[in-house]
A protein has these predicted regions:
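Conserved CoA-thioester-binding segment of acyl-CoA-metabolizing enzymes
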Residues: 1-51, 87
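Terminal peptide-recognition signature
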Residues: 13, 17, 32, 48, ...
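Residues at secondary-structure transition points
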Residues: 19, 23, 30, 59, ...
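Phosphate-coordinating loops and pocket residues in cytosolic domains that bind phosphorylated ligands
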Residues: 23-26, 57, 66, 157-158, ...
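A general structural signal for well-ordered alpha-helical segments in protein cores
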Residues: 29, 48, 61, 82, ...
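Glycine- (often His-adjacent) and acidic-residue-rich active-site loop
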Residues: 42, 50-88
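Crotonase-fold acyl-CoA enzyme core
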Residues: 88-177
């Protein structure tokens, strides 16, 4: 689910659901939130990366389907937990570096927007893909708006994919390697 490794003062967190492109479900959301809430005094930075061929595909569609049968109160509680995960990235007391490769869609872009530094491979592909599912990226919006401002409007509405170079142009990506 989540690989945690401490090395030379850096906490490495690996999203480890490669069979679903590291898509979020309740367990991964809880694991990432807990890990970021347990920063040790010796930790000087956090690196979040995806295992396998993708950084993060956003929400797991099977998990999202299950949510469609929940009550409004249950859905609100799940949305709050998701927000708290992004907020844990954003408010982490040490710098958070997102190390992006491959696809980074929806909520994956939320992690990127909440991170302090984003290092992306030149082959990474980003998209705020919620619109393709008939959804709005409400939970990640506060973090994305802080990071890229007015660029978010077009990207949210069109769900158009963009490469790491464009991500750097608009301020989502810090450096492309």
């Amino acid at each position: 689910m989540l690989i945690e490794e401490r090395k030379n003062g850096v906490l490495y967190l690996g999203l480890n659901r490669p069979e679903v492109r590291n898509a979020f479900n309740a367990s991964l959301i809880q694991a990432l939130t807990t890990a970021l809430s347990g920063i040790a005094e010796s930790d000087r930075a956090v690196v979040i990366r995806g295992e396998g061929e993708a950084f993060c595909a956003g929400g797991d569609l099977n998990w999202m389907r299950e949510q469609s049968t929940q009550s409004e109160a249950e859905n609100a509680a799940d949305a709050l937990k998701l927000y708290e995960m992004f907020d844990a990235v954003y408010r982490c007391p040490v710098p958070v570096i997102a190390q992006v490769h491959g696809p980074c869609f929806g909520g994956g872009c939320g992690i990127v927007a909440a991170a302090d530094i984003v290092v992306s491979s030149s082959s990474a592909l980003f998209a705020f893909s919620e619109a393709k599912l008939g959804l709005i990226p409400a939970t990640i919006s506060p973090f994305v708006l802080r990071k890229i401002g007015s660029y978010s409007r077009e990207l949210f509405v069109t769900a158009q994919p963009f490469d790491a170079g464009r991500g750097k142009e608009i301020g989502l990506v810090s450096s492309v390697v």
